[in-house]
């Protein structure tokens, strides 16, 4: 399945949760989900009872759409998490959090992961002093992630930094906002990552 490129607010209403896909509207409390917290369509307000498989599938979709990954990428990450020692679900979330586009978003250089992905692919981001244009690039603890010199006055990046200053920055990155760089200090603990996803259902789905 390819990466979702359709109307993001309709997707959030269908899944019933905010996926942080609309930055400024979400921060301003103007998202479609807040105004109409039910699925789109004629019968949207009457949510059908969901099966166990449907629940497992929904949790996978929420994670995929939130982090902006394809089915192939997601399955590959799950397989890697399953091979490692530890809690597979927590390790999956950790691997998703290490994606470069997500780290750019977490550092506050973009209001959404979608915009962060664009910044990466268009060459606006450096990792340890080198330009990296692959959104799925894995950022290792201790890495320096910065906005390229030519892009530091980009109005969208400046606006994003101003907006995310209202919401704060996660504990596993240190950011110098004025200089527009940050350090990915460590991998987060699962309980630190606040996302509306119950990854145990994803583990159940892929374990069948």
UniProtKB/Swiss-Prot annotation:
GO terms for cellular component: small ribosomal subunit. SUPFAM superfamilies: Alpha-L RNA-binding motif. CDD domains: S4. Coiled coil: none annotated. One of its GO terms (molecular function) is structural constituent of ribosome. One of its GO terms (biological process) is translation. Keywords: Ribonucleoprotein, Ribosomal protein, RNA-binding, rRNA-binding. Signal peptide: none annotated. One of the primary rRNA binding proteins, it binds directly to 16S rRNA where it nucleates assembly of the body of the 30S subunit. Belongs to the universal ribosomal protein uS4 family. Part of the 30S ribosomal subunit. Contacts protein S5. The interaction surface between S4 and S5 is involved in control of translational fidelity. This is Small ribosomal subunit protein uS4. It comes from Campylobacter concisus (strain 13826). The gene is rpsD.
């Amino acid at each position: 399945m390819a990466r979702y490129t359709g109307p993001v607010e309709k997707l959030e209403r269908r899944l019933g949760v905010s996926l942080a896909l609309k930055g400024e509207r979400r921060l301003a409390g103007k998202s479609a989900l807040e105004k109409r917290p039910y699925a789109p369509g004629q019968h949207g307000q009457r949510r059908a009872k969901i099966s166990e498989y449907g629940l497992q599938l929904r949790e996978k979709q929420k994670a995929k759409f939130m982090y902006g990954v394809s089915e192939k990428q997601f399955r590959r990450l799950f397989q890697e998490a399953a091979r490692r020692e530890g809690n597979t679900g927590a390790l999956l979330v950790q691997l998703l959090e290490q994606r470069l586009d997500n780290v750019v978003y977490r550092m506050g250089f973009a209001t959404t992961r979608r915009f962060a992905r664009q910044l990466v692919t268009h060459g606006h981001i450096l990792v340890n002093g080198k330009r990296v244009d692959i959104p799925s690039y894995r950022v290792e603890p201790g890495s320096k992630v910065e906005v390229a010199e030519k892009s530091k006055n980009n109005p969208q990046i400046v606006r994003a930094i101003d907006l995310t200053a209202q919401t704060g920055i996660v504990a596993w990155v240190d950011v110098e906002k004025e200089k527009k760089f940050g350090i990915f200090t460590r991998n987060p603990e699962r309980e630190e990552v606040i996302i509306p996803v119950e990854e145990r259902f994803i583990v159940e789905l892929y374990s069948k």
